[in-house]
């Protein structure tokens, strides 16, 4: 069993690998050192590249960034299967601007065999308290994502401040 700790702004994230004896050891991750200026708000593990191991999606946010700030970009780190993570060159679509993300969840929402992403905006930069939006990013099967929110769930526009999300079949309809 292993675990991830996201870093605050100017503090690097950390991964701890567990041993069979139940101890945890810090795994040095150079790309986390490079990205310590980001503020990690949430994180999730999912198999982004379909190779059977868990990759890492880190949600970036904060209220002191400007709307076009690069530090509002969510990041994907690819696991090489040995617990070593490297920043992916894969770019996620800007949903319409850089956002202060609060959460991300993963599910095959279009039932095509790959994972898609829901991204929830925590707050409007320089406009705290205004309604924020949710976004459905659909995977084309090759790791390229497109914003399909208007097609799949337009009511996610300015729904409110989104702090958490989870996919589940609540009504048992598949």
Question: How would you label these PLM feature ranges?
Answer:
Residues 25, 29-81, 85-87:
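A generic tandem-repeat structural signature
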Residues 1, 17, 39-50, 92-93, ...:
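Beta-propeller blade termini
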Residues 97, 111, 120-135:
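Surface loops at the rim/top face of extracytoplasmic beta-rich domains
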Residues 8, 48, 61-62, 109, ...:
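Flexible loop residues that form catalytic
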Residues 13-15, 56, 74-76, 134-136:
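Hydrophobic beta-strand positions in blades of beta-propellers and related beta-sheet-rich domains
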Residues 3, 17-38, 77-99, 137-160:
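Blade-edge motifs of beta-propeller repeat domains
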Residues 2-7, 56-60, 117-121, 165:
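Hydrophobic beta-strand segments that make up the repeating blades of beta-propeller
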Residues 8-11, 66-72, 126-132:
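Short, solvent-exposed loop/turn segments at conserved positions within beta-propeller repeat blades
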């Amino acid at each position: 069993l292993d675990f991830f700790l996201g870093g605050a702004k100017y503090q690097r994230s950390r991964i701890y690998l567990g041993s069979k004896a139940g101890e945890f050891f810090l795994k040095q991750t150079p790309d986390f050192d490079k990205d310590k200026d980001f503020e990690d708000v949430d994180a999730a593990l999912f198999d982004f590249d379909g190779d059977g191991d868990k990759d890492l999606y880190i949600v970036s946010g904060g209220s002191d960034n400007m709307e076009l700030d690069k530090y509002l970009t969510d990041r994907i780190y690819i696991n090489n299967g040995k617990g070593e993570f490297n920043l992916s060159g894969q770019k996620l679509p800007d949903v319409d601007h850089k956002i202060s993300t609060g959460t991300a969840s993963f599910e095959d929402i279009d039932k095509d065999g790959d994972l898609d992403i829901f991204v929830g905006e925590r707050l409007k930069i320089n406009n705290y308290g205004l309604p924020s939006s949710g976004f459905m990013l659909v995977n084309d099967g090759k790791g390229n994502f497109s914003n399909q929110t208007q097609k799949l769930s337009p009511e996610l526009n300015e729904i409110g401040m989104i702090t958490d999300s989870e996919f589940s079949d609540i009504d048992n309809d598949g």
